[in-house]
Amino acid sequence: VKLQDEYECFFMVADWHALMSEYAHPKDLKENLISNVIDWLTLGISPRKSTLFIQSHVKEHLELYMLFSFITPLGWLERCPTYKEQLREATNRDLSTYGFLGYPVLQAADILLYKAGAVPVGEDQLPHLELTREIGRRFNSLYKKDIFPEAQALLTKTPRILGLDGRKMSKSYNNFIAISEEPKNIRLKVQGMFTDPLRIKFSDPGHPETCNVHSYYAVFAPEREKEIASLCRQAKIGCTDCKKELAETLVKFLEPIQKKRNELLKNKKQIFNILEQGSRKAGCLASKTISEVKGLLNLR
């Protein structure tokens, strides 16, 4: 949210990316993506400061993706750690598709189409950002012109928060707490979180540095983190009580956010207007980049 005051920011509703992994279930795609935009607005993303747009409404993304695919070696894509991990974890769907293998190329097009100088990412996305830089460098080298800059990563103080089950946080794994989550569901989800595997009995001293529950305290209750860690190491607080306190902290943290979100839900027409205006603005910038690229490739 603070980046809006320092950079010209673009926030993209990645519907094509969503279809790459959920191609068999397009029914709820639109509603889910609009829900994401409402989350952004709720948390402080402002259409007066930033551009919010829908990926599929700016066709230049697809065009640059295709052109990048011509110059991207297969080996670059096959070595992506996220690709290998998701193939292993995908038990109920087939992700061994051309589209899924190539989604980092589309991601590169999403970034380089706007000649982004910086990208806010989590640690798990750093390999993808490096691949984006490699694709940009290769294009610049092949066609003897530095069109694309090397986008730098913007990491937060907590660059990675694991999912409730200790894996990468992902909608695909359903291991997250949504902004719109009801209090009873928050409590149930936190209750099921993985804790210190070495702590079997209450009297066993804990190891908060390896406990996923404790990592959430660092983000949502930093004022309690050190005390909770000390109590855990001395076996003066059990995992159940630790989870209960965290759950109530999250419920309280989300309460005003959910109130604001419910107000935004009442005016979905306004959300679509914001996205329509943003998509037009993004399209104008994207067309300039594509025109430049086509000139280098003798496609005009």
Protein language model regions, located:
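Extended aliphatic helical segments
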Residues: 1, 13, 37, 58, ...
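N-terminal Rossmann-like or analogous alpha/beta NTP/dinucleotide-binding catalytic cores
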Residues: 1-109, 258, 262
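Structured ligand/cofactor/substrate-binding pocket environments in proteins
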Residues: 9, 25-29, 48, 56-61, ...
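Active-site-proximal beta-alpha loop/turn segments in soluble metabolic enzymes
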Residues: 19-21, 114-117, 168-169
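A short secondary-structure junction signal
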Residues: 79-81, 116-117, 125, 172-173
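Conserved nucleotide- and phosphate/pyrophosphate-binding catalytic cores
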Residues: 127, 133-300
